[in-house]
UniProtKB/Swiss-Prot annotation:
One Pfam family linked to the record: IPPT
Site (Interaction with substrate tRNA): T102, R124
Swiss-Prot/TrEMBL keywords: ATP-binding, Magnesium, Nucleotide-binding, Transferase, tRNA processing
Binding site for substrate: T13, A14, G15, G16, K17, T18
Signal peptide: none
Classification via InterPro entries: Dimethylallyltransferase, IPT, P-loop_NTPase
Assembly behavior: Monomer.
Swiss-Prot/TrEMBL catalytic activity: adenosine(37) in tRNA + dimethylallyl diphosphate = N(6)-dimethylallyladenosine(37) in tRNA + diphosphate
GO BP annotations listed: tRNA modification
Cofactor needs: Mg(2+)
Region (Interaction with substrate tRNA): 36-39, 160-164, 243-248
Name of this protein: tRNA dimethylallyltransferase
Family: Belongs to the IPP transferase family.
Length: 313
């Protein structure tokens, strides 16, 4: 049986990935596998710039709306789901098109997963209790003692990752930094062609981000977050779903911690920082072809032709 093939289209947020993916779908019988850690959540449509109903009707999309905002999704589960979907899509005679910008998931898919333990509910509850009693700063100082390398890499207010790093240490007796340094060789069970949209004009990307954020507000983003607070009362500012860019800033605004203008400025700034991190990841990622989404169009046309050649069409 031939080895399955998959074409990956990567790029920063607001960089034209969805538009190009739909153009590819006009040319090839593809099914899209979302590479976006925010799109997995139901009831979070506006702030995640989720593909519209008409776009999802035009071409099948996978790994969208698969969990509630109070549930969790991981890189390990993405690798499992994506690998399975590549096989299923290929068996249907279609071409898998992986589209998104969650580079941690892509790295896990292409380079393999570290041998980290699964989350432990009892230990996590104990860490949460310590945070409530002594504060997040106490947990961060503890991490500095047992895993200074990871502590240096994390921000002191990164509650989720600080908790996870301590969890790994307490479960294994070894710091997370040691686990990450012992990654085993990884062989993909499919052929992969990796393309990326990398804008040369960063000012244009920043402008797109601001325009899209304001459009989200017009579409009812604040109301969407208000609905999340009502429908899922266990959500907090530290919940993984609310850590999605824009949602944390909206949450703070609804808590009364910021005014509307500050919320907008912080939301746009956070999205631009996300794009910067994504571009940093992309510079370290082996790429088969690159296009500028803001060029005259011929650059993106080359990516479409590259996809056709890769799939032998």
């Amino acid at each position: 049986m031939p080895t399955p093939k998959a074409f990956a289209l990567l790029g920063p947020t607001a960089g034209g990935k969805t538009a190009l993916a739909l153009k590819i779908a006009e040319t090839l019988p593809v099914e899209i596998i979302s590479l976006d850690s925010a799109l997995v959540y139901r009831d979070m449509d506006i702030g995640t710039a989720k593909p519209s109903a008409s776009e999802r009707a035009f071409v099948p999309h996978h790994l969208i709306d698969i969990i509630t905002p109070v549930q969790t999704y991981s890189a390990a589960r993405f690798v499992e789901d994506c690998t399975r979907l590549i096989g299923e899509i290929t068996a249907r005679g279609k071409y898998p098109l992986i589209v998104g910008g969650t580079m941690m998931y892509f790295r896990a898919l292409t380079q393999g997963l570290n041998d980290l333990p699964e989350a432990d509910a009892c230990l996590r509850a104990d860490l949460d209790e310590q945070k409530q009693m002594y504060g997040l700063d106490f947990l961060y100082r503890t991490l500095q003692q047992v895993d200074p390398e990871t502590a240096c890499r994390l921000k002191p207010n990164d509650s989720q990752r600080i908790g996870r790093a301590l969890e790994v240490y307490y479960l294994t007796g070894k710091p997370m930094s040691e686990h990450l340094g012992r990654q085993s060789p990884h062989t993909l069970p499919f052929d992969l062609h990796t393309a990326a949209l990398i804008p040369e004009n960063r000012a244009r990307l920043h402008e797109n981000i601001a325009l899209r954020f304001h459009l989200m507000l017009e579409q009812g983003f604040i109301g969407e977050v208000e609905n999340l607070r009502r429908r899922y009362p266990s959500l907090t500012a530290d919940s993984p779903a609310i850590r999605c860019v824009g949602y944390r800033q909206a949450w703070e605004y609804l808590d009364g911690a910021t005014d509307r203008q500050t919320f907008i400025e912080k939301g746009i700034a956070a999205t631009r920082q996300l794009a910067k991190r994504q571009l940093t990841w992309l510079r370290k990622t082996p790429l088969d072809c690159v296009a500028d989404p803001f060029s005259d169009g011929t650059s993106c046309t080359r990516l479409i032709e590259a996809a056709k050649r890769f799939f032998g069409v």
